[in-house]
Each structure stands twice: as structure tokens, then as C-alpha cells.
């Protein structure tokens, strides 16, 4: 295997895991969406074909990014931030979908700028934190500028509104600040100051705090606010050990809302059983483990921070999504990376994974 890795010059385990998740995701997107596609568009392949286009684009992006020196991305860090910011502002000029302004649309395709914002924040923070390492213990010249940038992007995403996306960006930024070694007292104080803002956002809309109450006692709200979660429980229970078979699940037949997006893991549980669930968890664990090892053995601070951020960008939503569909966390609206329907998420995650693979190549050049 090491000989094979040296020939490819990349971490073959990580590459295999990413490709396995992506292609299995296409299989499950078809399984979970064909009924919805027929009802909405009269074509069972509508969602599948759209995602397939993003998959091909993602594969092309992976090939290009894997052979593009990751150090050169540093010069594009500010540009990515500007483009992401412009996208987050531009969404408010497009029509809302289900009450939210989250997408840019053109010619039948749509793009979610908050997905790009996650990567932009990681790239910019990795570049800047590595360059300004000697100033990070100070509040005003160290932590404050990053908190200001983070607050601006998180605030825009919350206005869409997209609490899950805002939470992801915030956690990724804080994790990188912690990893870089900022003063923990200042970071903790900033976190404490952010709590009232989060509570206000939670209480500002009835459906948000109702979801929280329903999470605490889902069976009491099984007909309304916890309906989706209860249907997820039923999918897990119906799947048993081996599942009911690919395409044979019942919960996706308009019982489980968002079966092809936020709750695709529930359909995997029903159709592939607990063995399938554990296999998916194992592949994500492999991605996280390999990503962490790449970050630890990276050649410099910038590469290490970038690898850690990308690993968290993939691993954190995966863990949160699985916790949500199993009732361990309140509903957040986060998709499962590489598996859920969502071209923006797939495209950005594949591109970011390719950069992670490029960083891993340094280990095999020695």
C-alpha cells in the first residue's frame, strides 16, 4: 500500500474514502429522491442528474486542486473571502425558498455561498494565523480582528436565516483560533459574549425554540415539531441489522421530510441496516483520522491549520448530522458531506478534500 501511495503521491486511504462516500451518495440520492422527482418534475432522475453534474465538476476540481501547490492558495485567501462575502450579500436579491435566502440561481442551477464561506474562512484564517503567530496572545492586535471577520460572516448567514451554516462557520473559526494558540481567556470571554446573541436568535422565531422543546420531549410533539425526528426513529427501527434493501425503504415515501438532504442518513439506516450505518461511520472516521494525521505531520503551520480546518469542515457536519437524526442534538439543518443532495456542498467539499490530499503528498515526497 505504501508503494502504491508513493506512485500516486497522495494519501490513498483518504482519496478512497472521499470517492467511496461521493459515489455511494449518488446511489442514495437516487434512492431517496426518485419518488419526489416524479411527483415534482415527472422525471425520476431530476435530482440525480443535477447532483451528477456537480459530481463531475467536483471530480475535475479535485484533479486540478490535487496538482496545484497548496502554498499558492495563500495568495488567493483574500479573494476567496471577498467572493464569499459578495455571495452572502447577493442571496438577498434572489427569491426566498421556504422562507430563506440561501441560494444564487441561474439557468436552472443554484449555488449556496455559505458553503464557499466555510472554505474561505478556513483558508484565510490558516494563512493569516500562520503569518501573525507572534501577535495571537494579544486581544486587540491578535484575537479581535479575527472575531470581527468571523462575526461579519456568521451574522450574514444568520440573516438568511441559516442557523446550521452560521454555527458551522463559527465553530470552524473558533477551532482554528484555538489551534493557533490564541489567549484562551479572551476566547472564552468572546464565547460568553456570543451566548446572548445566540439565545436571542433562538427566541426570535417560534419554530426555533419549539424545535428545541420538541427535541427535549419528541414524542409529545410527534405530530408537529418533532414529526421529522420521529419518522427518523422509525426508519432506524425498521432497518434492523441488515436493512430492508436498497430502494425498498418506506420513510422516503413522503413520510420523512428532507429524506434526500438533511435526513439521508435515516434512509441509509432503513435500507442498509445497522451494518450499513456502522460502515458509513467507519468511512467518516477514516476521513477524520487521516485528515488529522495529515495536519499533524504537515510541513508548516499554514498547511497544518489548513488541513485541520478542512478535516473539521467535513467531520463536524457529519457528526452533527448523525447526532441530529438520532435525536442526540436538536435539528440544525446541516447536510451529510458527500452523501446528502446538495451540489454546493459536494463541490466545495471535494475541492477542499483535494487540497487536503495535496498537503498529504508532502509526506510521500520525502
Predicted features by range, described:
Residues 22, 31-34, 249, 340, ...:
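Short linear Ser/Thr-Pro motifs
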Residues 15-23, 27, 31, 37-228, ...:
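Hydrophobic alpha-helical transmembrane segments of multi-pass inner membrane proteins, especially
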Residues 1-2, 319-366:
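A juxtamembrane structural motif centered on a specific transmembrane helix
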Residues 214, 218-261, 265, 272-276:
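TM-adjacent membrane-interface loops and short helices in multi-pass inner/ER membrane proteins
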Residues 107-117, 159-161, 240-244, 334-348:
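Glycine/serine-rich anion-binding loops at beta->alpha junctions
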Residues 162-167, 244-249, 259-261, 330-332, ...:
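Transmembrane helix boundary and interhelical junction motifs in multipass membrane proteins
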Residues 1-9, 42:
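Cytosolic juxtamembrane amphipathic/interface segments immediately preceding
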